[in-house]
């Protein structure tokens, strides 16, 4: 009897996402969910009153899974860690509660979820750095401060792209994201545009292209905020995670 070749039986199994990556994936899911609700709420859109229910239920389940991933890390208790878990529990509750409401209120209940999930990701990364040296390998593509800021804004659901008269434009909310930066991220496989997936900029206007992180973008950003802070030459500083205190340039 001929032994079948084993080459075709060998394959790489992707490792499970880290807690930080899982929270970033959760933020992306909330962005997609909110965009879907925005499209349903467009003037003249005809949809079932509970069209959002299945998606909201999946988000509540995904949030509870993220909470378990965080608690499974067995980090030492701290006020910051406790606050992060509470925020995630609140997200799970709001997602679940949104199923009992019609679209306008349901959209309101998850409006801030992407930013909250990203804030939790940053907090967990900080706790892991503080409690033990990170084992995260440095990504092949080292992020510049500008790229890191742009990836953070994208992950929070703050960046969309449009076209007008043959030109491309990027619209952002907190930190500035230039079209050149977006193109660089796309060229490196870290970000992508989803055509006509985000709400219009004005009533009756065309849908915009949502900019989202790719799997590689999530991995690189998670690694960037998870690595221990090391000494740097004078005059160089790490790029801080953007905060909501920056003046908004684009309304929700």
Task: Map each language-model feature to its residues.
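Short alpha-helical segments that sit at the start of domains
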Residues: 125-157
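Short, amphipathic alpha-helical interaction segments positioned at domain boundaries
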Residues: 204-243
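Short acidic, hydrophobic short linear motifs in intrinsically disordered regions
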Residues: 158-176
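Eukaryote-specific long, low-complexity intrinsically disordered regions
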Residues: 133, 137-144, 193-194, 201, ...
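C-terminal amphipathic alpha-helix
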Residues: 12-37, 105-136
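Leu/Val/Ala/Ile-rich N-terminal alpha-helices, chiefly Sec-type signal peptides and the beginnings
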Residues: 1-61
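Long, low-complexity or tandemly repetitive, helically biased scaffold regions used
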Residues: 35, 39-108, 131
């Amino acid at each position: 009897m001929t032994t079948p070749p084993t080459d075709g039986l060998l394959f790489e199994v992707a490792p499970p996402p880290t807690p930080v990556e899982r929270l970033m994936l959760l933020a992306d899911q909330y962005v997609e969910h909110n965009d879907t609700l925005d499209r349903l709420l467009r003037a003249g859109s005809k949809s079932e009153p509970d069209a959002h229910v299945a998606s909201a239920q999946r988000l509540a389940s995904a949030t509870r899974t993220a909470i378990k991933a965080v608690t499974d890390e067995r980090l030492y208790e701290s006020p910051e860690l406790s606050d992060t878990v509470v925020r995630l529990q609140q997200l799970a509750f709001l997602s679940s509660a949104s199923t009992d409401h019609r679209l306008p209120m349901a959209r309101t209940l998850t409006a801030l979820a992407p930013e909250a999930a990203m804030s939790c990701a940053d907090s967990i990364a900080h706790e892991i750095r503080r409690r033990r040296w990170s084992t995260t390998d440095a990504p092949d593509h080292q992020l510049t401060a500008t790229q890191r800021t742009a990836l953070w804004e994208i992950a929070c659901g703050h960046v969309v792209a449009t076209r007008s008269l043959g030109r491309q434009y990027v619209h952002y909310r907190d930190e500035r994201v230039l079209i050149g930066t977006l193109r660089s991220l796309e060229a490196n496989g870290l970000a992508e545009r989803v055509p006509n997936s985000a709400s219009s900029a004005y009533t009756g206007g065309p849908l915009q292209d949502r900019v989202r992180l790719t799997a590689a973008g999530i991995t690189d950003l998670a690694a960037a905020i998870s690595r221990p802070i090391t000494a740097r030459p004078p005059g160089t500083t790490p790029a801080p995670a953007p905060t909501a205190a920056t003046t908004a340039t684009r309304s929700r």
